[in-house]
Protein backbone atom coordinates (compact mmCIF):
# COMPACT_ATOMS: atom_id res chain seq x y z
CA UNK A 1 0.00 0.00 0.00
CA UNK A 2 2.83 2.37 0.84
CA UNK A 3 4.59 1.61 -2.43
CA UNK A 4 1.41 2.45 -4.35
CA UNK A 5 1.12 5.78 -2.55
CA UNK A 6 4.77 6.65 -3.30
CA UNK A 7 4.24 5.78 -6.98
CA UNK A 8 1.18 8.04 -7.09
CA UNK A 9 3.10 10.96 -5.56
CA UNK A 10 5.87 10.53 -8.10
CA UNK A 11 3.39 10.93 -11.00
CA UNK A 12 2.45 14.43 -9.77
CA UNK A 13 -0.58 16.32 -8.53
CA UNK A 14 -2.24 16.40 -11.97
CA UNK A 15 -2.89 12.73 -11.82
CA UNK A 16 -4.76 13.22 -8.58
CA UNK A 17 -7.14 15.71 -10.26
CA UNK A 18 -7.81 13.66 -13.41
CA UNK A 19 -11.49 12.64 -13.72
CA UNK A 20 -12.38 9.04 -13.82
CA UNK A 21 -13.88 8.04 -17.16
CA UNK A 22 -17.39 6.63 -16.70
CA UNK A 23 -18.13 3.16 -17.87
CA UNK A 24 -20.41 2.95 -20.90
CA UNK A 25 -23.40 0.79 -20.02
CA UNK A 26 -25.44 -0.46 -22.98
CA UNK A 27 -29.05 0.83 -22.93
CA UNK A 28 -31.61 -1.65 -21.82
CA UNK A 29 -35.09 -1.43 -23.39
CA UNK A 30 -37.55 -1.43 -20.55
CA UNK A 31 -41.01 -2.90 -20.49
CA UNK A 32 -42.64 0.56 -20.50
CA UNK A 33 -40.79 1.73 -23.63
CA UNK A 34 -41.64 -1.44 -25.50
CA UNK A 35 -45.30 -1.13 -24.59
CA UNK A 36 -45.43 2.48 -25.84
CA UNK A 37 -43.83 1.55 -29.15
CA UNK A 38 -46.27 -1.32 -29.65
CA UNK A 39 -49.20 0.95 -28.76
CA UNK A 40 -48.08 3.57 -31.31
CA UNK A 41 -47.66 0.88 -33.95
CA UNK A 42 -51.14 -0.51 -33.35
CA UNK A 43 -52.60 2.99 -33.42
CA UNK A 44 -50.95 3.72 -36.78
CA UNK A 45 -52.25 0.43 -38.19
CA UNK A 46 -55.77 1.32 -37.06
CA UNK A 47 -55.50 4.78 -38.63
CA UNK A 48 -54.39 3.33 -41.97
CA UNK A 49 -57.19 0.76 -41.87
CA UNK A 50 -59.79 3.49 -41.30
CA UNK A 51 -58.37 5.48 -44.20
CA UNK A 52 -58.58 2.48 -46.53
CA UNK A 53 -62.01 1.28 -45.38
CA UNK A 54 -63.91 4.00 -43.52
CA UNK A 55 -66.77 2.70 -41.37
CA UNK A 56 -70.33 3.24 -42.59
CA UNK A 57 -72.12 6.25 -41.10
CA UNK A 58 -74.14 5.52 -37.97
CA UNK A 59 -77.35 7.19 -36.89
CA UNK A 60 -77.01 9.49 -33.91
CA UNK A 61 -79.81 7.56 -32.22
CA UNK A 62 -77.63 4.42 -32.25
CA UNK A 63 -74.95 6.13 -30.19
CA UNK A 64 -75.08 6.58 -26.39
CA UNK A 65 -76.62 9.59 -24.61
CA UNK A 66 -79.51 10.06 -27.02
CA UNK A 67 -82.93 11.33 -25.98
CA UNK A 68 -85.17 11.96 -28.99
CA UNK A 69 -87.75 14.02 -27.10
CA UNK A 70 -85.04 16.25 -25.61
CA UNK A 71 -83.40 16.66 -29.02
CA UNK A 72 -86.72 17.72 -30.56
CA UNK A 73 -87.18 20.35 -27.84
CA UNK A 74 -83.59 21.55 -28.24
CA UNK A 75 -84.06 21.92 -32.01
CA UNK A 76 -86.59 24.73 -31.60
CA UNK A 77 -84.57 26.48 -28.88
CA UNK A 78 -81.42 26.26 -30.99
CA UNK A 79 -83.17 28.01 -33.88
CA UNK A 80 -84.95 30.41 -31.49
CA UNK A 81 -88.32 29.42 -32.93
CA UNK A 82 -91.51 28.34 -31.16
CA UNK A 83 -92.65 25.02 -32.57
CA UNK A 84 -95.56 22.88 -31.52
CA UNK A 85 -93.84 19.68 -30.36
CA UNK A 86 -96.46 17.43 -31.94
CA UNK A 87 -96.17 19.21 -35.28
CA UNK A 88 -92.38 19.19 -35.14
CA UNK A 89 -92.28 15.47 -34.39
CA UNK A 90 -94.62 14.85 -37.32
CA UNK A 91 -92.38 16.95 -39.59
CA UNK A 92 -89.50 14.50 -39.08
CA UNK A 93 -91.54 11.34 -39.84
CA UNK A 94 -91.34 10.23 -43.48
CA UNK A 95 -93.63 7.73 -45.14
CA UNK A 96 -90.68 5.47 -46.05
CA UNK A 97 -89.86 5.12 -42.34
CA UNK A 98 -93.44 4.13 -41.48
CA UNK A 99 -93.51 1.52 -44.25
CA UNK A 100 -90.15 0.02 -43.25
CA UNK A 101 -91.12 -0.22 -39.56
CA UNK A 102 -94.45 -1.85 -40.38
CA UNK A 103 -92.66 -4.34 -42.66
CA UNK A 104 -90.27 -5.23 -39.82
CA UNK A 105 -93.21 -5.86 -37.51
CA UNK A 106 -94.85 -8.11 -40.07
CA UNK A 107 -91.66 -10.15 -40.39
CA UNK A 108 -91.69 -10.67 -36.62
CA UNK A 109 -95.17 -12.18 -36.86
CA UNK A 110 -97.06 -9.43 -35.07
CA UNK A 111 -100.79 -9.29 -35.64
CA UNK A 112 -102.09 -6.95 -38.34
CA UNK A 113 -103.91 -4.74 -35.84
CA UNK A 114 -100.70 -4.17 -33.87
CA UNK A 115 -98.52 -3.72 -36.95
CA UNK A 116 -99.86 -0.26 -37.80
CA UNK A 117 -97.88 2.55 -36.20
CA UNK A 118 -99.59 5.48 -34.57
CA UNK A 119 -97.54 7.93 -36.65
CA UNK A 120 -98.53 10.50 -39.24
CA UNK A 121 -96.45 11.19 -42.34
CA UNK A 122 -95.02 14.66 -42.99
CA UNK A 123 -96.41 14.75 -46.54
CA UNK A 124 -99.06 17.39 -45.81
CA UNK A 125 -96.68 19.63 -43.85
CA UNK A 126 -94.09 19.35 -46.61
CA UNK A 127 -96.57 20.45 -49.28
CA UNK A 128 -97.60 23.45 -47.18
CA UNK A 129 -93.98 24.40 -46.52
CA UNK A 130 -93.01 24.06 -50.18
CA UNK A 131 -95.91 26.18 -51.39
CA UNK A 132 -95.32 28.90 -48.81
CA UNK A 133 -91.55 28.94 -49.43
CA UNK A 134 -91.92 29.36 -53.18
CA UNK A 135 -94.52 32.12 -52.82
CA UNK A 136 -92.55 33.93 -50.13
CA UNK A 137 -89.27 33.75 -52.06
CA UNK A 138 -91.02 35.05 -55.17
CA UNK A 139 -92.27 38.06 -53.22
CA UNK A 140 -88.83 38.70 -51.73
CA UNK A 141 -87.07 38.58 -55.10
CA UNK A 142 -89.68 40.63 -56.94
CA UNK A 143 -89.37 43.38 -54.32
CA UNK A 144 -85.57 43.31 -54.43
CA UNK A 145 -85.15 42.99 -58.23
CA UNK A 146 -88.17 44.68 -59.84
CA UNK A 147 -86.52 44.81 -63.28
CA UNK A 148 -85.96 41.06 -63.48
CA UNK A 149 -88.43 39.13 -65.67
CA UNK A 150 -90.70 36.41 -64.38
CA UNK A 151 -88.54 33.69 -65.92
CA UNK A 152 -85.49 34.91 -64.00
CA UNK A 153 -87.39 35.10 -60.70
CA UNK A 154 -88.69 31.57 -61.23
CA UNK A 155 -85.19 30.24 -61.90
CA UNK A 156 -83.83 31.89 -58.75
CA UNK A 157 -86.68 30.43 -56.69
CA UNK A 158 -86.04 26.99 -58.20
CA UNK A 159 -82.36 27.32 -57.29
CA UNK A 160 -83.08 28.31 -53.67
CA UNK A 161 -85.65 25.53 -53.22
CA UNK A 162 -83.60 22.95 -55.12
CA UNK A 163 -82.22 19.76 -53.64
CA UNK A 164 -78.61 20.93 -53.36
CA UNK A 165 -79.27 24.20 -51.50
CA UNK A 166 -82.00 22.82 -49.24
CA UNK A 167 -79.97 19.74 -48.25
CA UNK A 168 -76.96 21.94 -47.48
CA UNK A 169 -79.06 24.09 -45.14
CA UNK A 170 -80.79 21.07 -43.59
CA UNK A 171 -77.53 19.28 -42.78
CA UNK A 172 -76.07 22.38 -41.16
CA UNK A 173 -79.20 22.73 -39.01
CA UNK A 174 -78.92 19.06 -37.90
CA UNK A 175 -82.21 18.16 -39.58
CA UNK A 176 -80.63 14.97 -40.92
CA UNK A 177 -79.88 13.66 -37.41
CA UNK A 178 -83.54 13.99 -36.36
CA UNK A 179 -85.11 12.70 -39.59
CA UNK A 180 -86.85 9.34 -39.32
CA UNK A 181 -86.07 7.65 -42.62
CA UNK A 182 -85.63 4.12 -43.90
CA UNK A 183 -82.07 4.77 -45.13
CA UNK A 184 -79.10 6.49 -43.54
CA UNK A 185 -77.51 8.76 -44.67
CA UNK A 186 -80.88 10.27 -45.50
CA UNK A 187 -81.45 10.49 -49.30
CA UNK A 188 -81.47 14.08 -50.64
CA UNK A 189 -85.11 13.90 -51.76
CA UNK A 190 -86.24 12.75 -48.31
CA UNK A 191 -84.11 15.38 -46.58
CA UNK A 192 -85.54 18.10 -48.82
CA UNK A 193 -89.09 16.98 -48.03
CA UNK A 194 -88.30 16.96 -44.30
CA UNK A 195 -86.90 20.49 -44.37
CA UNK A 196 -90.03 21.84 -46.05
CA UNK A 197 -92.12 19.90 -43.51
CA UNK A 198 -90.25 21.77 -40.75
CA UNK A 199 -91.18 25.04 -42.50
CA UNK A 200 -94.79 23.85 -42.65
CA UNK A 201 -94.72 23.05 -38.93
CA UNK A 202 -93.31 26.51 -38.19
CA UNK A 203 -96.02 28.08 -40.36
CA UNK A 204 -98.76 26.40 -38.33
CA UNK A 205 -97.01 27.02 -35.01
CA UNK A 206 -95.78 30.63 -35.25
CA UNK A 207 -97.58 32.11 -38.24
CA UNK A 208 -96.46 33.47 -41.63
CA UNK A 209 -94.40 36.38 -40.27
CA UNK A 210 -91.92 34.24 -38.32
CA UNK A 211 -91.82 31.71 -41.15
CA UNK A 212 -90.93 34.44 -43.64
CA UNK A 213 -88.06 35.51 -41.37
CA UNK A 214 -86.89 31.89 -41.20
CA UNK A 215 -86.92 31.60 -45.01
CA UNK A 216 -85.08 34.90 -45.36
CA UNK A 217 -82.39 33.94 -42.85
CA UNK A 218 -81.67 30.44 -44.14
CA UNK A 219 -82.57 30.42 -47.85
CA UNK A 220 -82.08 33.97 -49.13
CA UNK A 221 -78.60 33.98 -47.58
CA UNK A 222 -77.58 31.14 -49.91
CA UNK A 223 -77.44 33.70 -52.74
CA UNK A 224 -74.45 35.39 -51.10
CA UNK A 225 -71.41 35.18 -53.36
CA UNK A 226 -73.40 33.66 -56.22
CA UNK A 227 -73.38 35.10 -59.71
CA UNK A 228 -76.73 35.55 -61.47
CA UNK A 229 -76.11 33.12 -64.30
CA UNK A 230 -74.82 30.43 -61.94
CA UNK A 231 -78.38 30.22 -60.64
CA UNK A 232 -80.15 31.06 -63.90
CA UNK A 233 -78.88 28.99 -66.82
CA UNK A 234 -79.44 30.75 -70.15
CA UNK A 235 -78.39 29.39 -73.55
CA UNK A 236 -78.64 32.50 -75.72
CA UNK A 237 -77.73 35.62 -73.72
CA UNK A 238 -77.57 37.84 -76.81
CA UNK A 239 -81.10 36.89 -77.85
CA UNK A 240 -82.40 37.61 -74.34
CA UNK A 241 -80.61 40.97 -74.33
CA UNK A 242 -82.21 41.95 -77.65
CA UNK A 243 -85.66 41.09 -76.24
CA UNK A 244 -85.05 43.12 -73.07
CA UNK A 245 -83.83 46.14 -75.03
CA UNK A 246 -86.81 45.87 -77.35
CA UNK A 247 -89.16 46.03 -74.35
CA UNK A 248 -87.41 49.24 -73.31
CA UNK A 249 -87.63 50.74 -76.84
CA UNK A 250 -83.85 50.61 -77.29
CA UNK A 251 -82.20 49.68 -80.56
CA UNK A 252 -80.48 46.33 -80.97
CA UNK A 253 -76.87 46.23 -79.71
CA UNK A 254 -73.88 46.26 -82.04
CA UNK A 255 -70.80 44.26 -81.07
CA UNK A 256 -67.31 45.60 -81.75
CA UNK A 257 -63.88 44.28 -80.93
CA UNK A 258 -62.36 46.81 -78.52
CA UNK A 259 -59.12 45.12 -77.42
CA UNK A 260 -57.15 41.96 -78.05
CA UNK A 261 -53.94 40.37 -76.84
CA UNK A 262 -51.98 37.26 -77.80
CA UNK A 263 -53.98 36.52 -80.91
CA UNK A 264 -51.29 34.21 -82.32
CA UNK A 265 -50.49 32.47 -79.02
CA UNK A 266 -52.08 29.51 -77.27
CA UNK A 267 -53.91 31.81 -74.83
CA UNK A 268 -55.49 34.67 -76.78
CA UNK A 269 -57.71 37.25 -75.11
CA UNK A 270 -60.37 39.39 -76.75
CA UNK A 271 -62.59 42.17 -75.41
CA UNK A 272 -65.89 42.83 -77.16
CA UNK A 273 -68.02 45.89 -76.45
CA UNK A 274 -71.74 46.26 -77.07
CA UNK A 275 -72.97 49.62 -78.33
CA UNK A 276 -76.49 51.03 -78.42
CA UNK A 277 -77.01 54.42 -80.08
CA UNK A 278 -73.23 54.86 -80.21
CA UNK A 279 -72.94 54.34 -76.43
CA UNK A 280 -70.97 51.55 -74.79
CA UNK A 281 -73.38 49.60 -72.57
CA UNK A 282 -71.20 46.58 -71.70
CA UNK A 283 -67.84 44.97 -72.36
CA UNK A 284 -66.76 41.38 -71.83
CA UNK A 285 -63.62 39.23 -72.19
CA UNK A 286 -63.20 35.80 -73.76
CA UNK A 287 -60.76 33.43 -75.43
CA UNK A 288 -62.63 33.88 -78.72
CA UNK A 289 -64.62 36.76 -80.16
CA UNK A 290 -67.87 34.78 -79.87
CA UNK A 291 -67.28 33.93 -76.20
CA UNK A 292 -66.39 37.55 -75.46
CA UNK A 293 -69.59 38.70 -77.17
CA UNK A 294 -71.70 36.33 -75.04
CA UNK A 295 -69.96 37.51 -71.88
CA UNK A 296 -70.61 41.13 -72.83
CA UNK A 297 -74.29 40.26 -73.27
CA UNK A 298 -74.34 38.72 -69.77
CA UNK A 299 -72.71 41.86 -68.33
CA UNK A 300 -75.39 44.00 -69.99
CA UNK A 301 -78.17 41.77 -68.61
CA UNK A 302 -76.76 42.01 -65.09
CA UNK A 303 -76.84 45.79 -65.38
CA UNK A 304 -80.41 45.77 -66.66
CA UNK A 305 -81.60 43.49 -63.84
CA UNK A 306 -79.65 45.24 -61.07
CA UNK A 307 -77.67 42.07 -60.24
CA UNK A 308 -74.14 43.42 -60.72
CA UNK A 309 -71.16 42.39 -58.61
CA UNK A 310 -71.08 45.74 -56.81
CA UNK A 311 -74.81 45.74 -56.08
CA UNK A 312 -76.16 46.80 -52.72
CA UNK A 313 -76.25 43.91 -50.23
CA UNK A 314 -79.56 42.46 -49.12
CA UNK A 315 -81.10 44.60 -46.38
CA UNK A 316 -81.71 42.43 -43.31
CA UNK A 317 -82.07 45.28 -40.81
CA UNK A 318 -85.56 46.56 -41.68
CA UNK A 319 -87.50 43.75 -43.35
CA UNK A 320 -91.09 44.09 -44.48
CA UNK A 321 -91.92 40.52 -43.64
CA UNK A 322 -95.41 41.35 -42.35
CA UNK A 323 -96.61 42.66 -45.70
CA UNK A 324 -94.76 39.99 -47.67
CA UNK A 325 -96.00 37.22 -45.43
CA UNK A 326 -99.59 38.39 -45.80
CA UNK A 327 -99.18 38.40 -49.59
CA UNK A 328 -97.63 34.92 -49.49
CA UNK A 329 -100.27 33.36 -47.27
CA UNK A 330 -103.03 34.94 -49.36
CA UNK A 331 -101.52 33.67 -52.62
CA UNK A 332 -100.92 30.17 -51.27
From Swiss-Prot:
Known role: Component of the 39S subunit of mitochondrial ribosome. May have a function in the assembly/stability of nascent mitochondrial polypeptides exiting the ribosome.
Disease / disorder: Combined oxidative phosphorylation deficiency 16: An autosomal recessive, mitochondrial disorder characterized by hypertrophic cardiomyopathy, liver steatosis, and decreased levels of mitochondrial complexes I and IV in heart and skeletal muscle.
Locations listed in the record: Mitochondrion
Keyword annotations from UniProtKB, A to Z: Disease variant, Endonuclease, Hydrolase, Mitochondrion, Nuclease, Primary mitochondrial disease, Ribonucleoprotein, Ribosomal protein, RNA-binding, Transit peptide
Pfam families the record matches: DSRM_MRPL44, RM44_endonuclase
Domain DRBM: 236-306
Main location: mitochondrion
CDD domains, A to Z: DSRM_MRPL44 (cd19874)
Protein name per its UniProtKB record: Large ribosomal subunit protein mL44
Targeting presequence: 1-30
Organism: Homo sapiens (Human)
Gene: MRPL44
Oligomer and partners: Component of the mitochondrial large ribosomal subunit (mt-LSU). Mature mammalian 55S mitochondrial ribosomes consist of a small (28S) and a large (39S) subunit. The 28S small subunit contains a 12S ribosomal RNA (12S mt-rRNA) and 30 different proteins. The 39S large subunit contains a 16S rRNA (16S mt-rRNA), a copy of mitochondrial valine transfer RNA (mt-tRNA(Val)), which plays an integral structural role, and 52 different proteins.
Record-stated family: Belongs to the ribonuclease III family. Mitochondrion-specific ribosomal protein mL44 subfamily.
MF (Gene Ontology): double-stranded RNA binding; endonuclease activity; RNA binding
EC number of this enzyme: 3.1.26.-
Amino acid sequence: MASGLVRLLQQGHRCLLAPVAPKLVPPVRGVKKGFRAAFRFQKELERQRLLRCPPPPVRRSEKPNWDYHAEIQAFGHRLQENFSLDLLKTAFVNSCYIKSEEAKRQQLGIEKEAVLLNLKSNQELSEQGTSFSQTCLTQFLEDEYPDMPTEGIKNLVDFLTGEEVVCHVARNLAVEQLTLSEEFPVPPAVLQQTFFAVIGALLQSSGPERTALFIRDFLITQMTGKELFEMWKIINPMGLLVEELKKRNVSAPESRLTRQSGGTTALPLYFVGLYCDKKLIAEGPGETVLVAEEEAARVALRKLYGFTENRRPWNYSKPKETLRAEKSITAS
